[in-house]
Amino acid sequence: GRVELLARPAIGLVGARNASANGCGFARKLSHSLCDAGYVVVSGMARGIDGAVHEAALKADPNAHGGTIAVLGGGVDVIYPREHRDLYGKLCEQGCVISEMPPGLQPQARHFPRRNRIISGLSYGTVVIEAGRNSGSLITARFAGEQGRDVFAVPGSPTDPRAAGPNSLIRDGAILCDSADVILDALRDATQNTHLFEDFHQFNTNARSPEVNSDPARYDDIAQSIVQDAENSGSKEPSQSIEIDSELGDLSPTDTDADQSGKVLDLLSTTPLLIDDLIRASELPANSISSILIELELAGRVERHPGNRVSRIAK
């Protein structure tokens, strides 16, 4: 890909794989705005938030000198998830794809904390958009803090499990992020004097600071400590499984009715969403969405609202 992107000012955007449509929409908005402001956005090419971030960045104004970098958990030539094959191709042409793993190596759960460390290390700040209490995105946030980077979190409804991670980060001192302006204002002092803005095309791997411990085993220990903290928190919500372990849980996804219902439910949050937007986000036929919503409504999982909107019912 375009290796010169590695020398440009970057911001990491990470979040849930089972992100809601509203969460993905906000991720796209942030990504597009940051790229238009001249930043490179960095993410992990996973489902959900990551994919939305990369897709929006690729559509941003090319004259703004933004761009996007995908950090993979396997070899740089291994496409995961499989449905991101087209996105991978576009990233190789218009963005940059990197990995510290050898070519051909299939992704494994233990690789993802190391990938997350690279995402935060490349970035002046890391933004978490929707993440469960046990999400692997919180590993990226912790790495960012240890590396001296800013940590931003997008707040969410306390009734949505996917807001537990960002809300917790905000309580712990992360910067509340409700627009790209918050990020740009916070990072302006950090970037206004750097030579990175003066010569976008000079590849300089020494531009990032501060220096951090690069011992891979250390990052495995950090990841394990986060997992342990999550287990001790007493959260038993099925959707809150540790995402660094579940990244590989569906290499061969099926398309059964149960899978489609789960996909629709994952896209919904307690904030009402237009059914038309749900159809676009799910990429399912309108008649299938209609049937699924009826089933979920009868099961007490979703609620309809005026204006052809629907929301998930909090448990």
Locations of regions flagged by a protein language model:
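Glycine-biased, small-residue-rich flexible motifs in mid-sequence functional cores and linkers
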Residues: 1-315
